[in-house]
From Swiss-Prot:
Swiss-Prot/TrEMBL site (Important for specificity toward positively charged substrates) positions: 87
Function of the molecule: DauA is highly expressed within the cystic fibrosis (CF) lung, and it is required for virulence via the optimal production of hydrogen cyanide, pyocyanine, pyoverdine, rhamnolipid and alginate during biofilm formation. Involved in the catabolism of D-lysine and D-arginine. Under aerobic conditions, the arginine succinyltransferase (AST) and arginine transaminase (ATA) pathways are 2 major routes for L-arginine utilization as the sole source of carbon and nitrogen. The D-to-L racemization of arginine by DauA and DauB is necessary, before to be channeled into the AST and/or ATA pathways.
Notes on temperature effects: Optimum temperature is 37 degrees Celsius.
A GO MF label: nucleotide binding
GO CC entries: cytoplasm
Alphabetical keyword list: FAD, Flavoprotein, Nucleotide-binding, Oxidoreductase, Virulence
Residues involved in FAD binding: 14, 32-33, 41-48, 171, 331-336
Pfam families: DAO
Name listed for the protein in its UniProt record: FAD-dependent catabolic D-arginine dehydrogenase DauA
Highest taxon above the source species: Bacteria
Required cofactor(s): FAD
EC code(s) of this entry: 1.4.99.6
Keyword Phosphoprotein recorded: no
Amino acid sequence: MIEADYLVIGAGIAGASTGYWLSAHGRVVVLEREAQPGYHSTGRSAAHYTVAYGTPQVRALTAASRAFFDNPPAGFCEHPLLSPRPEMVVDFSDDPEELRRQYESGKALVPQMRLLDAEQACSIVPVLRRDKVFGATYDPTGADIDTDALHQGYLRGIRRNQGQVLCNHEALEIRRVDGAWEVRCDAGSYRAAVLVNAAGAWCDAIAGLAGVRPLGLQPKRRSAFIFAPPPGIDCHDWPMLVSLDESFYLKPDAGMLLGSPANADPVEAHDVQPEQLDIATGMYLIEEATTLTIRRPEHTWAGLRSFVADGDLVAGYAANAEGFFWVAAQGGYGIQTSAAMGEASAALIRHQPLPAHLREHGLDEAMLSPRRLSP
């Protein structure tokens, strides 16, 4: 039996970021069932940073993460975590009221937010079909996130603090014994006073193993594809383009273009694969909105995004199980919120108040707590 202060189940962005901040305060062991961390969600993300997206809780967590992303600790990564990538939300359905609503809510958080007419939007992304565009919002503060550098930085930090990240360690049995949690894997057994459930789409399954009431987590599939831009088209400096009704998005990606129908199809937690219909839908919508022709995607994939009923993230102790801490329901926001979410989770696990710089963004324990979901 290997002893630790904190056992974290799941080495995706939720478990990695929480373990990173916890590792300064005790021995952390992260148990990951796959051969590599982040296989199901983190490694399949489009990874874009924008404050003007998501629920108020998500926006607060995203804003509170920016300082860490802009100035990570020395040695955390070898190059910047963020690179400029503005976001342009385009109205293709002639819905000026919704465009104005999104502009005003975004500008309250991002003073640099601009409202564009159709000509301005088309000048920024010249392949847009002018007759299909009715206006846009433009957030110049958006950025691409180097997901791998961020994720690996968290995992390295755990190891530097004498923690362990153990892949191919699936939790087979979880028991509460003499005031501690014991987790049995094929490769060995582990014990700690605190068990952090950061298993992504499998969080409810882990709770079931532990005899803890589930959150009602719903995994959802999102499909995406990569395709080449037309010859002679330089798309490097295009913004991330999102349709106002969130029916698709398009963004430059290492000289190629990444597209998605922005689907959120309820599924069981599994090694999700893209559906041909999803990919075809995304291609059709992009071709309808732009002059781009997508002959055949270079690569297609799908990832899992997991939600609870209110769409917010969860960080807090279970009401009915001592020492069982949820870090769950990252939805599509886990990477852009990871710095604040990891630091907040680590504080709450240790029964400490949230750090002042997180509270300054309007975050508090109650808005993260799983108890808000109780009937």
